[in-house]
Amino acid sequence: MSEVLPLLYLHGLSSNDFTPALEQFLGSGAGLSASTITRLTAQWQDEARAFGARDLSATDYVYLWVDGIHLKVRLDQEKLCLLVMLGVRADGRKELVAITDGYRESAESWADLLRDCKRRGMTAPVLAIGDGALGFWKAVREVFPATKEQRCWFHKQANVLAALPKSAHPSALAAIKEIYNAEDIDKAQIAVKAFEADFGAKYPKAVAKITDDLDVLLEFYKYPAEHWIHLRTTNPIESTFATVRLRTKVTKGPGSRAAGLAMAYKLIDAAAARWRAVNAPHLVALVRAGAVFHKGRLLERPTDITPPTSPSDGGQHAGTEVA
């Protein structure tokens, strides 16, 4: 029962519903009340704090997805914004790196988080993926300057469509997909030229949203082709937080910011057991070691593929659809 209670609560049963719901199965003498959930949330807050203070020196995160997720808080006029970082370890497995309360567009909020992770032993990721509006980018250039940047195509696509009339959406969407689904970077650049030719005269602002960020939109093509589907969007965060948003919608939001952070942490922790490794996980260690990939294929294999074991300021070893 100690394992069932958290699952029931996390997946949508409000604390006020516990007693009548469980009495249907266990009888009126079950002795379970909403106070049990109050104790559980306090326990989850302790677990979230311990997670946020853990040592990071033993784990190497090669890829990093970042985003700021807003959740409604019942007892607070402002929404809670969770700064979330999910990483891909050198063995190809996905893992929650950090989650904290902050401001999505604030460089200082992200810098505080990154500095704390670095202090606890985090090594600079090779590549970070996120929305261009995040304050993360200014922060990562300061804390981990060698980390490469990839803008999320999911967010960019939405930004471009917002600058176009609805009548142009179907053709624009098809043209955008030709860019990020291209066979290689050369064909992606040809698709960009086609998009510019089709929409540039009438909608220059929409086209500029892609052409102005082209380098960081096409960065993912420099990595293994098997990883492209993972690296072009922040879908791992979006899909994970679909569960968090559903849970908070059922209960009309957590009662406090601390409870919201703890609930999100526990939901992600529960979901992590179902996360699959990235495609071709053996190639992640090669990326960390500095292997060169051309058109998605290994061009130059480094002699040393041992992941770094100590924190650095960012130095790296030498040697279909949006998803």
Swiss-Prot record:
DNA-binding listed as a keyword: yes
Pfam families: Transposase_mut
Ranges of compositional bias, category Low complexity: 304-313
UniProt region (Disordered), positions on chain: 300-323
A single GO molecular function term of this UniProt record: DNA binding
Keyword annotations from UniProtKB, A to Z: DNA recombination, DNA-binding, Transposable element, Transposition
Entry's Gene Ontology BP terms: DNA transposition
Function description: Required for the transposition of the insertion element.
Family affiliation: Belongs to the transposase mutator family.
NCBIfam families (alphabetical): transpos_IS256
Protein name per its UniProtKB record: Transposase for insertion sequence element IS6120
